[in-house]
Structures are given as C-alpha cells and as structure tokens.
Amino acid sequence: LVAYARSIEKEHNKNFRFTMTTNGIGITDEVIDWCNKECHNVVLSLDGRKEVNDRFRVDLAGNGSYDRIVPKFQKLVKARGGQGYYMRGTFTHHNVDFTKDLFHMADDLGFTELSMEPVVAPPDSPEALTEEDLPKLFDQYELLANDMLRRQKAGKPITFYHYILDLKHGPCIYKRISGCGSGTEYMAVTPWGDLYPCHQFVGDPNYKLGNVWDGVTNTTLRDEFKLCNVYARPDCKDCWARLYCAGGCAANALHATGDIHGTYEYGCKVFRKRMECALMM
C-alpha cells in the first residue's frame, strides 16, 4: 500500500505522510528501517509501569508484553534520533495516578514524546473512569503541567501531546468545527477491504461505509457524519472550549449516548481541564 502511494504521489502532486501504530511485538530491525524510510510518525503503545501495562497488554497465553516491547521501543526511538514518535498509553480506573506512568516512561525508560488517553469503556466496566475519579484526574493534569514547566526550566523538556497548543497559528475554522473528519475525509480500511468512519467503528455493520472496490456505498451514513460537528451538538453551544475540541469524538459520543451527535460529558470535563493546563503553560 505504501509503495503504491509512493509510486503515484508525484504524478498527482501529493505528499503522503504515513503513521504506523504498533504494540511492539512485531518490531524487527527490518521494521525499524522501513519505519524510518516511510513513516512520518510512529505511535508506540505502552501504558506505563510494568504492572499497569501488563494488566491489559498481554499475549494469547496471558503473559504481559512489557519486558518484550520496551527494549524494541527504545531501539526504534534511538534509530529515529528521538524524533517522529509518540509513546501512547491509556489510563483507566485502575491507574488514575497516570503521571507516575508518564514519569516512568520519561525518567526510567528515556522517552520524551508522550501521550496518555483516558479509557473509553461502558459505564459498568471495572475499568471505566468514575465521577469520583475526576478530582484525582484534575490534580494529575495540574501536577503534569507544573512538572513539565520544571523540566523545561531545567533544560530537559518532555512533550505531552494534549498540551500542545498553538495560540497564533491554530487549525482553520473548518477543522475547528469538524475535528478529525471521520466518515467523510477520514476513514478506516480493514485488512479485508471494508470501509468504516474510523477504527472505533470497525466490526459494527451499522457503520460500514462500503469497501475499497465499490467505494462509499452507504451515502446516507456518510451524509450523517458530514453533519457531525460542534454546531450539531446543542450542549456545546455555551462551552468555552468548543472550538478546541470540535464537539469531541463521534465514537465516544456513540458509546456514551447512543448517538454520534451526542455529548460525552465526562470526556468534556477532562478535555476542559487539559485545555486549562495547556493555556496556563
């Protein structure tokens, strides 16, 4: 697929940028060389501390992956010159002290480009974040922001994806209201050729858009996603952060409310706190 895109990009005056996300198990020297040649960015899935990561990231035999993947991640990052990558983790109800996971990746493992996302799970899941978790999460985001400032002053900065904010040259207004563009200008392609609005919808027949041979055949669904923006969500009307989140994630809204035009209020609270910290910094 990448080779095909490279073969036609000059002909069509395009500049394709590829990102690969990996759990690390299949990384080899050959994979590292390919990533350095073809990938603008590489996303490396690691949830932080060994006990946190190995709670969910296990193989078919139930064995944790931490000890196998960390050396591979370190080798890949070194080969990329410490650039063009992100360590991407997920925190759950079991590790609301997620700054410990970020600091472990930075201080113990040597990674500086970091991202940590709140879990998206059914409310009755043991992993789901709760209202009682929110004050702890808010404290964690403030702790992270202050520690990043300390590191910056010490000349050893780290990057946290969700604190990257450009107040002078931000996204155009279209991106500010429509976000990722799932279902219209952004789609997930499965290994068997089916098209979905994004990876979160893969496997749900109600959200299959078409396939790579016939193109988008479910035009009604495409048109529904076309209207999925911040102005389609009444709850966003009075939110000060609405043009930073573009109404939020359609998949999160669907999981929380049953409607892609709904509002995942818990996620809104977390997002606003992240924006407060980013603006403070």
Put a short name on every predicted segment:
Residues 1, 22, 26-28, 51-52, ...:
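Flexible loop/turn segments at secondary-structure boundaries
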Residues 1-119:
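Radical SAM/AdoMet-radical enzyme domain recognition
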Residues 51-56, 113-135, 157-171, 200-206:
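Flexible glycine/acidic-rich beta-alpha junction loops that bind and position SAM and/or redox cofactors
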Residues 135-169, 199-246:
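C-terminal accessory region of radical SAM enzymes
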Residues 171-177:
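Short, flexible cytosolic linker that couples an ABC transmembrane/permease module to its adjacent nucleotide-binding
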Residues 180-183:
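Short, small/polar residue-rich loop motifs at catalytic or cofactor-binding pockets
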Residues 192-194, 206, 231-281:
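Radical SAM enzyme core and accessory elements
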